Amino acid sequence: MMMIYLSLSLGLLIFSSSNKHLLVTLLSFEFLILLLFSLLVYSNYMSMINAFIFLSVTVCEGALGLSVLVSLVRSSGSDQVQFLNE
């Protein structure tokens, strides 16, 4: 259980400090979602159908994030967040 909390704090640290590239931010966000899922499953808080719904929504969120990343790279040529202000 302590390992999950340590990973959660590390994931939050990476998410808050990664402000240059959108890909690193999306990967750290997915890492946090998977840690939240493992925490909920470990504590027996979710039933099996709720776990599948949670994972389905997470996959849809990841696909939308990747589509935003691809459109950003096609329009600006880079995944750096500083190009979003232009």
UniProtKB/Swiss-Prot annotation:
Q: How does it sit in the membrane?
A: Multi-pass membrane protein
GO CC, alphabetical: mitochondrial membrane
Q: What is its EC number?
A: 7.1.1.2
Q: Name one GO molecular function term.
A: NADH dehydrogenase (ubiquinone) activity
InterPro entries listed in its UniProt record: NUOK/Mnh_C1-like (IPR039428)
Q: Name one Pfam family in it.
A: Oxidored_q2
* Task of the protein: Core subunit of the mitochondrial membrane respiratory chain NADH dehydrogenase (Complex I) that is believed to belong to the minimal assembly required for catalysis. Complex I functions in the transfer of electrons from NADH to the respiratory chain. The immediate electron acceptor for the enzyme is believed to be ubiquinone.
What name does this protein carry? Answer: NADH-ubiquinone oxidoreductase chain 4L
Q: Which gene encodes it?
A: ND4L
